[in-house]
């Protein structure tokens, strides 16, 4: 039975894996350049990063590597993690009162060395946010370090008026697709 290596230090991804009864044998922090390429579409961006992260982690012959990447997009514009509070404020202003996409790429490299990748898109619509709501959310610090500047599993859930697709995708790892990929390479599921 292969051992699972999670190519992510995200506590949210570990929590999500635990929901499907999966506990990584090892955690590794992949080192790759996450800068979007000029003109790169959000779907292509997350697929490239997920594959790059999975392949960047050293793997023993009996190990399977799982990596993921999530981003938020408004149209073709990719919203990465906010650099600072003004950037977070700008992102929340862009998301206010509109629909956006949350894209995740998930990649599993099996014991055969083959990379298997899936892309998942969830549509989220935020209510119109007041300046006071944006100020309070920025002050909470919750949006820092999160793609698109918000955590749907936290205070920002109250901003969501519509969601179409995978909720776990918005948290950071689409569980349906992840479960299928892990099963396809022999990782036992709970």
UniProtKB/Swiss-Prot annotation:
<dbReference type="GO" id="GO:0005737">
    <property type="term" value="C:cytoplasm"/>
</dbReference>
<dbReference type="GO" id="GO:0036221">
    <property type="term" value="F:UTP diphosphatase activity"/>
</dbReference>
<dbReference type="InterPro" id="IPR029001">
    <property type="entry name" value="ITPase-like_fam"/>
</dbReference>
<keyword id="KW-0378">Hydrolase</keyword>
<dbReference type="InterPro" id="IPR003697">
    <property type="entry name" value="Maf-like"/>
</dbReference>
<feature type="site" description="Important for substrate specificity">
    <location>
        <position position="70"/>
    </location>
</feature>
<protein>
    <recommendedName>
        <fullName>dTTP/UTP pyrophosphatase</fullName>
        <ecNumber>3.6.1.9</ecNumber>
    </recommendedName>
</protein>
<keyword id="KW-0963">Cytoplasm</keyword>
<keyword id="KW-0546">Nucleotide metabolism</keyword>
<feature type="site" description="Important for substrate specificity">
    <location>
        <position position="12"/>
    </location>
</feature>
<dbReference type="GO" id="GO:0009117">
    <property type="term" value="P:nucleotide metabolic process"/>
</dbReference>
<dbReference type="Pfam" id="PF02545">
    <property type="entry name" value="Maf"/>
</dbReference>
<comment type="function">
    <text>Nucleoside triphosphate pyrophosphatase that hydrolyzes dTTP and UTP. May have a dual role in cell division arrest and in preventing the incorporation of modified nucleotides into cellular nucleic acids.</text>
</comment>
<dbReference type="GO" id="GO:0036218">
    <property type="term" value="F:dTTP diphosphatase activity"/>
</dbReference>
<feature type="site" description="Important for substrate specificity">
    <location>
        <position position="153"/>
    </location>
</feature>
<comment type="similarity">
    <text>Belongs to the Maf family. YhdE subfamily.</text>
</comment>
<feature type="active site" description="Proton acceptor">
    <location>
        <position position="69"/>
    </location>
</feature>
